[in-house]
């Protein structure tokens, strides 16, 4: 009989803090321990920013502080009374009368020793796993083997999950390579700001929903070879920015409704994935999911699709706002393996990877070559009136709402499906009140700089507090960007979401 591969089991207690309370609990991510030598080094000697970036106190000390007092004064002046000055609005027409972070605690066990699971369990705060990881192998760091997930299942009786890790044969002379395993999900670190700026009315809105839903792993990884059927979902975190025009009602409706419409569409796709293999690529699947979601919300706003109303069990066919009201929508689903961005309009999502700002959306402007051709082919006109505008009115070629400009202005989004990288620093979602006065690169560099400066000044917050609500470092970055945009002359509402993609930032000091 062939000798069975040795296995180690560990039991974890997880919290199902999602919108679907009845959904099974599963291990969503395990840390890839191919770099165990780095992970096991002394914490005081680590030069790690959770993505291969070295951060030293000297580096942070060099970050510039100039202009902060001027910005604070600008913000104070703006909040005390915004000037009602005419500017180039999006619309020239009728205006309607609004992760807990997981510490990387690692246990090295000799290959021949016995394991006691009770000794390997880390502290759990409010039912959420704060830290756990097991590496089985030789005591020498250089010889720690790569672990491979075989099973990640759920014990229905105890609401716990068991992970079985297959170990390389002790007689093997080489390490297992090329396998991908996941670390347990980290609560996202985010900060937001949304200010009226120099406008007479606030028409922006935003939505943040950490741990919003469970994403089928087949929508992210496909039928990955060697992946256990028990590892079925990853936790998705939702972020969205909506820049209204002609009034605030459409943006507000998108803020309250769009992520739930997305969850409904993903739930429908889940059923299809369970029943059959669609054979579609993941990009195509996400295109369909977000397009259906955006069209549903647009139909509800227009009154063509029934929508739920508070205090009534029946759905109503009633327009949310007048035909001249609309909104942009840029939303992001962030999970441990991918970022999925869907955009309709001229709000924007930008990823800072390494030292490069990577736009994950492209503004829908009427003078964009493909958009210009689409509008003209539909019988519309792009007229130059304080910039390119559809029929001289709307300064974007796609939006949710704006019934009076259909079919020239459409609610169909463009979707970007982006795998995560170790070098990912932060993700910025913002309305054009920011992007009109600052470019992608400077926004990303400033956001990262302010995050690092906050950590230099305040240190790392307690592990149990991270991920619970707004992250103060991200909030500092968002606030600073909004003040800087005002100082640079932004005339629009400004809404910004800063998401720190580094689960944990550590600094080494030089003596």
UniProtKB/Swiss-Prot annotation:
According to the UniProt entry, the coiled-coil residues are none
> Could you say which residues bind Mn(2+) 1 here?
243-244
Q: According to its record, what is known about the domains?
A: The 'lock' site stabilizes the complex made of PP2C, ABA and PYR/PYL/RCAR receptor by keeping receptor 'gate' and 'latch' loops in closed positions.
Q: What is its EC number?
A: 3.1.3.16
| Protein name per the record | Protein phosphatase 2C 16
Q: Which family does it belong to?
A: Belongs to the PP2C family.
Organism annotation? Arabidopsis thaliana
Q: What induces it?
A: Repressed by MYB44. Induced by ABA.
A Gene Ontology MF term for this entry? metal ion binding
Q: Which cofactor does it need?
A: Mg(2+); Mn(2+)
Q: Which UniProt keywords apply?
A: Abscisic acid signaling pathway, Cytoplasm, Hydrolase, Magnesium, Manganese, Metal-binding, Nucleus, Protein phosphatase, Signal
Entry-linked PANTHER family: PROTEIN PHOSPHATASE
């Amino acid at each position: 009989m062939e000798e069975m591969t040795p296995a180690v089991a560990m039991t974890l207690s997880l919290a199902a803090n999602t919108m679907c309370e009845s959904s099974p609990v599963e291990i969503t991510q395990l840390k890839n321990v191919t770099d165990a030598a780095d992970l096991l080094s002394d914490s005081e000697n680590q030069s790690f920013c959770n993505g291969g970036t070295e951060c030293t106190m000297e580096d942070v000390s060099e970050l510039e502080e100039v202009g902060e007092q001027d910005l604070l004064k600008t913000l104070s002046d703006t909040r005390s009374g915004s000037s009602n000055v005419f500017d180039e609005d999006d619309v020239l027409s009728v205006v309607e009368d609004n992760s807990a972070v997981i510490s990387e605690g690692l246990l090295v066990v000799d290959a021949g020793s016995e394991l006691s699971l009770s000794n390997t369990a880390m502290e759990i705060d409010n039912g959420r796993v704060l830290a756990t990881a097991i590496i089985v192998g030789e005591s020498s760091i250089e010889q720690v083997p790569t672990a491979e997930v075989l099973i990640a299942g759920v014990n229905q009786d105890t609401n716990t999950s068991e992970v079985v890790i297959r170990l390389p044969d002790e007689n093997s002379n080489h390490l297992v390579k090329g396998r991908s395993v996941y670390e347990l999900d980290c609560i996202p670190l985010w900060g937001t700001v949304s200010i009226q700026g120099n406008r007479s009315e606030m028409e922006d809105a935003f939505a943040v929903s950490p741990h919003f839903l469970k994403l089928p792993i087949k929508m992210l990884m496909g039928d990955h070879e060697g992946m256990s059927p028990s590892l079925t979902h990853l936790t998705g975190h939702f972020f969205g920015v909506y820049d209204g025009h002609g009034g605030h009602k459409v943006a507000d409706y998108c803020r309250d409704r769009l992520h739930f419409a997305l969850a409904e569409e993903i739930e429908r796709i889940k059923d299809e994935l369970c029943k059959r293999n669609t054979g579609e690529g993941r990009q195509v699947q996400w295109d369909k999911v977000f397009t259906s979601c955006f069209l549903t919300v647009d139909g509800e706003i227009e009154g063509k699709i029934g929508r739920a109303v508070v205090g009534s069990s029946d759905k109503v066919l009633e327009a949310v706002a007048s035909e001249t009201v609309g909104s942009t929508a840029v939303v992001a689903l962030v999970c441990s393996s991918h970022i999925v961005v869907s955009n309709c309009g001229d709000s924007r999502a930008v990823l800072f990877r390494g030292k490069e700002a990577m736009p994950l959306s492209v503004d829908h402007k009427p003078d964009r070559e493909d958009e210009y051709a689409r509008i003209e082919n539909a019988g519309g006109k792009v007229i130059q009136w304080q910039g390119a505008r559809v029929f001289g009115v709307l300064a974007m070629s796609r939006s949710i709402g704006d019934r009076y400009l259909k079919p020239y202005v459409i609610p169909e989004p463009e979707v970007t499906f982006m795998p995560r990288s170790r070098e990912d620093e932060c993700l910025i979602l913002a309305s054009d009140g920011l992007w009109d006065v600052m470019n992608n690169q400077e926004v990303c560099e400033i956001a990262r700089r302010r995050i690092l400066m906050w950590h230099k000044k305040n240190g790392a917050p307690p592990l149990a507090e991270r991920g619970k609500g707004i992250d103060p470092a991200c909030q500092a970055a968002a606030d600073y960007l909004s003040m800087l945009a005002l100082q640079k002359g932004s005339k629009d509402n400004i809404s910004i979401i800063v998401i720190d993609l580094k689960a944990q930032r550590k600094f080494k000091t030089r003596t």
